From Swiss-Prot:
The record marks 16 as: Transition state stabilizer. This is 4-hydroxy-2-oxovalerate aldolase. Keywords: Aromatic hydrocarbons catabolism, Lyase, Manganese, Metal-binding. The keyword Cell membrane does not apply. PROSITE patterns: PYR_CT. Its EC number is 4.1.3.39. Catalyzes the retro-aldol cleavage of 4-hydroxy-2-oxopentanoate to pyruvate and acetaldehyde. Is involved in the meta-cleavage pathway for the degradation of 2-aminophenol.
Amino acid sequence: MIDQAKKIYISDVTLRDGMHAIRHRYTLNHVSQIARALDEAGVDSIEVAHGDGLKGSSFNYGFGAYSDLEWISAAAEAVKQAKIATLLLPGIGTVHDLREAYDAGARVVRVATHCTEADVSRQHIEYARGLGMDTVGFLMMSHMQTPVGLAQQAKLMENYGAQCIYVVDSGGAMNMWDIAERFKALKDVLDPATQTGMHAHHNLSLGVANSLVALENGCDRVDASLTGMGAGAGNAPLEVFIAAAERMGLNHGCDVKKLINAAEDIVRPLQERPVRVDRETLALGYAGVYSSFLRHAETAAKKYNLSAFDILVELGKRRMIGGQEDMIVDVALDMAKGRVLPT
């Protein structure tokens, strides 16, 4: 049973994870308009960055239309209540980049690592705490760790100073029982003062359900995005999640109608590729593949006259993770040369 009196921290990711859906091409006007709408609707924080975090703009991940600092500044100037958050992946972004993001207006940082590599986050978490930022540990591809193993990684992040630890279903590959087991494991080892969060992807159409199950198991913060704008089939759609929470009598603090209008009037028209469950995005959840591989796999499939579905399934078989985007072309070349049989 979910505590109806407990305030759910609503973390919007339309302006960070949503970058993947449009190849990191938001204009500054888009950012201002979306941030203002989210702020007026009552969300607690708005994450802003290249889809792959601070300094993600690159040949490997895709170049952004603007710099992270320009996007963050535009969002910070547009809001009155919501905190501006950002994402940092050690090895891509540095503490110097984090300082610049802080100066531009970011007050929350999520330090993201693969679910087996929490130890690389220490420097960044400690630095963020030194700045006085709300500091979050973000364990990506959480389906690739056992619940106990994930909890051990979460404990490392807590020891470094993280105030909240996220279960991150980057592949949209987990079901409700997977989520429940991981939150129970985290709660068994973390200090009661350390919060937990849920970042869902909708590749198996379970983004909202998994977020609700997370809340049922003590989760404090929930990520979501307008129309689900995000990598793959997107994240838990914010307006849908809030509508469901409203019907359950949960304390979310948001205006449902304003979110629905922002989703339909502002965000959906920006989608060059519909953010939905289809053959390719379902492959991500089915094969347990990093959701941001989608657009890269589709590009490779077109170039080499292959099926994006088959490329994604093969990537899942090889257990590729975020940061190995260059391997998508290698897999496509192997398939084109007949070294790998189609699924």
